[in-house]
Amino acid sequence: MKITKIEKKKRLYLIELDNDDSLYVTEDTIVRFMLSKDKVLDNDQLEDMKHFAQLSYGKNLALYFLSFQQRSNKQVADYLRKHEIEEHIIADIITQLQEEQWIDDTKLADTYIRQNQLNGDKGPQVLKQKLLQKGIASHDIDPILSQTDFSQLAQKVSQKLFDKYQEKLPPKALKDKITQALLTKGFSYDLAKHSLNHLNFDQNNQEIEDLLDKELDKQYRKLSRKYDGYTLKQKLYQALYRKGYNSDDINCKLRNYL
C-alpha cells in the first residue's frame, strides 16, 4: 500500500492510501514511522502504525484530561472509552501513565484526604465513599484514613455548627443537631460525641424561655391554619418537644398562650 496523501487537520494528520483506506494519526506517528507521500507500507507496518497512532492519540487525550486536576486510573480509562479508544490500547496508556507518574491512585487518595483536612468538612466514611466512586480501591484508601486524625476537623465542624444554631435551639436540640450533622458528614458517633466536649452549651433560663417563645410563635402560625382547640394544643406540644424543649416548660407556656 502506498500513501497518496498526508494532510494536517488541526491536531491530527489525515493519511490516505491507494487502496481507498484512510486514517488519522498524530504528529508523533508521522515522525516515528517517517511517513511521507508515496511511501509504501506492508500490512504489518500499517498495523503497527495504526496501533501506535491510537496509543499516541489516546495518551495525548489522557494528558489533556489530567492537565485540569489529578485523576484516578478508572477516571482516565472511562474518559478514553468515551473517545472510543480500544480497551487494549487503554491498558497500555494507563501503564505508561503510571510508569511516568502521571497517575497514582494512592497519591490521589492522600492528596484528597489532606485537602479535606485543610479546607473540607467530611469525615472518613464519606471520604472513603467519594474515593471509591472515583474508582480508587479500598486498599489504597484505608491505610491513609487510619493514619489520619479527624478529631480536630470534627471539632472545627462542630464549632461552626454551634455558632450557626446556638441562638436558635435549646441545648439538647443543639447537641442532637450537631451530632446528626457530623454523622451525615461521615464522622463516627464516638468522634461526634467527643467533639461536643469543647463546646459550652450552658444557657440561662431567660435565654431558653426566649427561644421557646420564638419557636412557639413560629409553630402556632404554621399549625393554627389546620388545627384548633385541643388538637392544636397537642400538635404544638409535640412540635416543641421534638425541638428539645422541656416538657414542663412547654405545658406552662401553652397554658398561658392558648
Swiss-Prot record:
Compartmental location: Cytoplasm
Pfam hit, one: RecX_HTH1
Any Gene Ontology biological process: regulation of DNA repair
Gene3D superfamilies per record: Winged helix-like DNA-binding domain superfamily/Winged helix DNA-binding domain
InterPro entries: RecX_HTH_1st, RecX_HTH_2nd, RecX_HTH_3rd, Regulatory_RecX, WH-like_DNA-bd_sf
Source domain of life: Bacteria
Keywords on record: Cytoplasm
One GO CC term on file: cytoplasm
Family of the protein in this entry: Belongs to the RecX family.
NCBIfam families according to UniProt: PRK14135.1
Its job: Modulates RecA activity.
This protein's name: Regulatory protein RecX
Native organism: Streptococcus pyogenes serotype M3 (strain ATCC BAA-595 / MGAS315)
Lineage summary: Bacteria, Bacillati, Bacillota, Bacilli, Lactobacillales
